[in-house]
Amino acid sequence: QPYIGTVEVGNADGPYVVVNDFTFNTSDGDDVIEYGETVTISMDLKNVGSELTSDVNVTLSIDDAYILMLDDTDSFGDIAPEETSSIDNAFSFLVAAEVPDNYSFTIVATVTGSGQTWDYNLNMTAYAPVLSFEGVSVDDPDGQLDPGDTVEIGVIILNSGGASIAGPMAIFSSSDAYITLNSSDTYTMLDIHPDMEEMAYFNLTASPDTPIGHIVSFNLQVISGFIYNSNLSGSLTVGLTWEDFESGSFVTLPWNFSGNADWEI
């Protein structure tokens, strides 16, 4: 992304070098800074002063748990008044796999030349996937898992983050005594792009002894390569579930309440 901002030139008598603009390139070529990526920075400097600025050097620095500078210095030589000096891929940094989504950070560019020093902020944003469990699709004529059924389920996962996750593997686990996993516990999913849903498929059998309305809890670990790991919790109800309030309370289903008044039947 080009650097856009206001440069306070002050008194431009003598040498005065500014960051004219900068662009970055990401390791996957989409120009979006994402988790686990190596990013290179190309920079263009301009001498807006009235004198030659000699031996111009730039050092980039940042104190951030999610950003690591890999190549932080470069020399831009001498720059005459109103002239520019550019270097492609002059600097590079690594984004941590754990970076939060929509994470803003600032790299400080310290420019030196002719005994002068100028600091400029390079503002950028990094993105990461944000996965959540959105429900279960049951491949059965009545659309539900009943006691004694063997069905294929599709666990629906939403990515509400700003970065895609490529070819993730979903690992299913459950300690529920009424459920038997017939398929592999690992399913390789399609890429999950921002604001998109994808499914992980597994084959399950519910014991004939499973109580109607029993809620099966499970975990889904989603991993991609060595850089992404997310643990999700989900649930699936066995049999048709309804609320007739004959119990005289709200214990049949996990109701949520709001407001200040007491809820009663």
Predicted regions and their residues:
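Short, solvent-exposed loop/linker segments at the N-terminal edge
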Residues: 28-37, 142-149
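Terminal connector regions
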Residues: 1-11, 92-129, 205-239
